[in-house]
Amino acid sequence: MSSKQEPVILGKIGSSYGIKGWLKITTYTDSVEGIFDYSPWLIKEQGEWREVKVAQWRFQGKAVVACLEGVSTRDEAQALTNCEIAVPADQMQDLPEDEFYWRDLIGCEVINTKGYNMGTVQEIVETGSNDVLLVKANAKDGFGKAERMIPFVTDQFIQKVDLAAKQILVDWDPDF
């Protein structure tokens, strides 16, 4: 990976909450409060990332709200509505060898055990029982597929993930 990695998006700022600069936070982390384990945040305003710190946060029903340092009015909060929340990639914890961040799998080439190039991972869908790779097939797919959905079940369908080569080896029939 390059030394200048893209920030990792962990959530998004929603609408303002109250009149004292609080913001509703949409989080993409496993637990709702997990986004607050990271500091500082980067928020993207008008295409540029800038660093911010969370002054306070709390649960509001099933959601969370936060107050950022330097944001103390409703107008200042409203100006941040829909900004993405990210952290530098180097803040992400190292995972065990057999676990992967979704962001690292997106863009990987998917090849089956017979050598057929199934396409490229476009996104990953959380289904409850297991994650599913949404693979966009190559333009001239020999089986007439536009996309494939392959369950991310290691040792059953996922045989090997090589992040350095950006390839995922699967035991999957290309006609599915």
Curated annotation (Swiss-Prot):
Location within or outside the cell: Cytoplasm
One GO location term (cellular component): ribosome
GO molecular function term, any single one: ribosome binding
Annotated keywords: Chaperone, Cytoplasm, Ribosome biogenesis, rRNA processing
Keyword flag Cell wall biogenesis/degradation: no
Pfam families per UniProt: PRC_RimM (PF24986), RimM (PF01782)
Phosphoprotein keyword on record: no
Coiled-coil segments: none
Any one GO BP annotation for this protein: rRNA processing
InterPro entries referenced in this protein's UniProt entry, alphabetically: PRC_barrel-like_sf, PRC_RimM, RimM, RimM_N, RimM_N_sf, Transl_B-barrel_sf
Domain PRC barrel: 97-176
Superkingdom to which the source organism belongs: Bacteria
Domain remark in the UniProt entry: The PRC barrel domain binds ribosomal protein uS19.
Primary role: An accessory protein needed during the final step in the assembly of 30S ribosomal subunit, possibly for assembly of the head region. Essential for efficient processing of 16S rRNA. May be needed both before and after RbfA during the maturation of 16S rRNA. It has affinity for free ribosomal 30S subunits but not for 70S ribosomes.
Subunit structure: Binds ribosomal protein uS19.
PANTHER family per record: RIBOSOME MATURATION FACTOR RIMM
Family: Belongs to the RimM family.
Protein name: Ribosome maturation factor RimM
Organism field: Shewanella pealeana (strain ATCC 700345 / ANG-SQ1)
Chain's gene name: rimM
